[in-house]
Amino acid sequence: MPKPLVDFGNKPMILHQIEALKGAGVTEVVLAINHQQPEVMLNFVKEYEKKLEIKITFSQETEPLGTAGPLALARDKLVDESGQPFFVLNSDVICEYPLLEMIEFHKTNRAEASIMVTEVDDPSKYGVVVTEEGTARVESFVEKPKHFVGNKINAGIYLLSPSVLDRIELRRTSIEKEIFPKIASEKKLYAMVLPGFWMDIGQPKDYITGQRMYLNSLREKTPQELATGDNIIGNVLVHESAVIGEGCLIGPDVVIGPGCVIDSGVRLFGCTVMRGVWIKEHACISNSIVGWDSTVGRWARVFNITVLGKDVNVADAEVYNSGVVIEEQGL
């Protein structure tokens, strides 16, 4: 399964972004890929082009092009006679996507490039974006600073004017390390501070943290989407087709996907249970991810950032702990 199509909050990761782009007035989305389009990706495009009434196309690399080269490759798809700027998003990023606000920010500052930044408590493990005091103009980038220079980091969402493409050669190029510093040196790069939550969910631990943040956001903005009931604790998202048995305790911070069957006496917290999963009686799953069409046996325990792939069968009373990643096999 291509990572952008992995479920998050009961929809493919990338669908969160495409819906936000649609809401901001975008009419065409270009997916940059570095492999043959698997059938599942083609099916996704066919389904959601129709549902969202938005054009979705591919730009495929034949060799690695870094984070900037794919933009040069897709130039003909990104530039038209209007000269309007275009968004670039990292597919692993989950947030509230304030894209309309970013368009206004870009216009107000007459920026060549605008980047979204988020504020973190410990910036030492990130590349820090340093802005001029009292303004949003980017001065420099400092990779994993040893001393405090700021707490803003790149959030992986950009709005670029077409002229940025003139700076990018069709070769392996880093937009963060090669292109943005040049634009910043010309005082044409601006950083918008992202309101609300943000997480790069590309790793299992961050996925689970991001899910908690996402559910908190739903609680604030659309609480009617969350489950309620005597067996629900905190923020829980349950697909309408899922079946939950008696005596279960679900939550907090749980997502249950379509077609799931949760038998009686099951305990779930801090976890994702994806489409078609069967959790048998009295099993317990915490801080873990259970992939599509898997089965977890009676009294089994799955916890501590364990990831089960597709079609995994966990035997009755088995215990799985701490980062085990298993795909399409019995345990």
Curated annotation (Swiss-Prot):
Keywords: GTP-binding, Nucleotide-binding, Nucleotidyltransferase, Transferase. GO terms for molecular function: GTP binding; mannose-1-phosphate guanylyltransferase (GTP) activity. SUPFAM superfamilies: Nucleotide-diphospho-sugar transferases (SSF53448). Coiled coil: none annotated. Pathway: Nucleotide-sugar biosynthesis; GDP-alpha-D-mannose biosynthesis; GDP-alpha-D-mannose from alpha-D-mannose 1-phosphate (GTP route): step 1/1. Its EC number is 2.7.7.13. It holds the Pfam family GMPPB_C. GDP-alpha-D-mannose binds at residues 66, 90, 92, 127, 154. Diphosphate binds at residue 3. It catalyses: alpha-D-mannose 1-phosphate + GTP + H(+) = GDP-alpha-D-mannose + diphosphate. GO terms for cellular component: cytoplasm. GO terms for biological process: GDP-mannose biosynthetic process. Belongs to the transferase hexapeptide repeat family. Catalyzes a reaction of the Smirnoff-Wheeler pathway, the major route to ascorbate biosynthesis in plants. This is Probable mannose-1-phosphate guanylyltransferase 3. The lineage of its organism: Eukaryota, Viridiplantae, Streptophyta, Embryophyta, Tracheophyta.
